[in-house]
Structures are given as C-alpha cells and as structure tokens.
Regions:
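Short, acidic, metal-binding catalytic loop of nucleotide-sugar glycosyltransferases
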Residues: 20-30
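Short beta-strand/loop segment that forms part of the nucleotide-sugar
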Residues: 29-41, 56-57
C-alpha cells in the first residue's frame, strides 16, 4: 500500500512512536524504511526498539540522499517522505491517501496530510481534500506515486542536502495543479530543537548551502521537472 521513507538519528523513541501510531491506525500493511547512522550513539537503542526489517544502517550522509536511497528500496507504489517526529492520528489514513491517487489515471499527484498548523492565507475553513493554489503550504511530509519518482528520477530533489525539499516539490506540484492538501488525514508534527535538529542546522553550513541552491538553480530545475510531469499527464498514464 504505502512505504514510509524516514532518515533518523538520535531519536529511537520517536521512531518507535511513528511505527506504533501508523500501525495502530492503518487499514493495510505499511512498509517502514528507516535509514540509521552507524556513528549514532543511540544506534543500539534503535535496534532494541525497531524490527530489523524496518531499518538500514550506513554512514552519516545528506538527508536527501537517504530519502532517495530508501525510495529506491520501497516495495509499494505510494511512497511517503517522512520525518521521525510524526504521530499518525487518523484511522484508515492509508486508505484515504490511496483513494486520492486512484482519482488520477497517471498517478501524478502530491498528497500533503495536515500537520495541525494553519494553512496558507485562504480565508475559508478547509475540511475536504483540496488542490492547493500556488501559495506555500506549511507541511513537510508528503506522498507521491512511483510514477512521479520514476519520471523525475528521485523522491527528494538531490541538489538539496536537507532543506527546501517540501518547498520545491510543492512548487512543482502546484504548477501542474496536482498538489493536494488532505485535511482529513492528520500527521501531527512539530519543529524540534534537540541535538539532531541542531546538528543539521549547524553542521557544514547546510542551511546557507541549501539557501544558495534554492536561490540560484531552482528555476531551471523546476521548469525541467514540470515539463517532464506534464508529458506524463498529457499521455494519460504513468511510466
């Protein structure tokens, strides 16, 4: 049904909570794909809490590279880019997400669950699935189909290290009118300021690096990705 791709470091209890809340509310069988770091001091705790089939251990690397490695391993057609801080709060969330993809023959769609935050500047109360206009949607986690991944060659744009992944992907999806906000599914998340978050924010100037990529190269890559996805939509079927 759905594969979760989740790089995780220093948060074994949160990783376990994600698995527990997703499985307690799923209708089908979710595939959990965690990427863990071999230099994480909490690695053994992960191994104690998670089923061995749910994780891969490797060197510390960019979050985007980890997301893409995990997406390549995903067995299910719908793939979710996830963080380890999520608590799944909606019963049959997987069936609800699948239902939205079933409405599109080509399966070119980005589904963005609610994370509990106010959405954009729209002046009406949104209660139903909504194709989002071309304005930012503050939610970091999303689902796409393998047709999307196979068309572009990646789940997370590989020219970023960690930041702007949701911003970039939403921009692509909104330009082709395929960014679907799904308020009927809640993946509760909040910004953390623990050692893991601080490591990403302070290590190797990652924020400024991704800022520069977003500022200098996004226009060319956006245009190319939009064109490729529009070709699939025009043809009426996925790859």
């Amino acid at each position: 049904m759905i594969s979760f791709c989740i790089p995780s470091r220093g948060r074994p209890k949160l990783a376990k909570r994600l698995v527990d809340t997703a499985t307690a509310t799923q209708k089908h069988n979710t595939e959990f794909l965690f990427y863990l770091n071999d230099d994480d001091e909490k690695l053994e705790e992960y191994k104690d809490l998670l089923d061995e089939k749910h994780y891969t251990v490797g060197p510390n690397q960019s979050t985007c590279y980890s997301w893409n490695q995990l997406a390549d391993r995903a067995r299910h057609d719908i793939v979710m880019l996830m963080g380890d801080d999520v608590r799944v709060q909606t019963q049959d969330w997987d069936e609800k997400i699948k239902k939205e993809f079933s409405k599109y023959e080509d399966k070119i769609l980005m589904v963005v669950p609610s994370d509990g935050r106010e959405k954009g500047t729209l002046k009406f109360e949104i209660e139903e699935p909504t194709l989002w206009p071309d304005e930012p949607l503050p939610a970091a986690h999303f689902a796409v189909h393998k047709n999307w991944i196979n068309t572009l060659g990646y789940l997370a744009p590989p020219f970023f290290w960690h930041f702007y992944v949701d911003t970039y992907t939403q921009k692509v999806a909104r330009k082709i009118n395929r960014c679907l906000y799904l308020p009927t599914v809640v993946f509760k998340a909040k910004k953390l300021f623990d050692d893991t978050a601080n490591r990403v924010r302070s290590n190797m100037n990652i924020i400024k690096r991704d800022d520069a990529v977003w500022t200098k190269v996004r226009k060319r890559h956006l245009k190319a990705d939009i064109n490729e996805l529009e070709k699939v939509i025009k043809n009426g079927s996925g790859r």
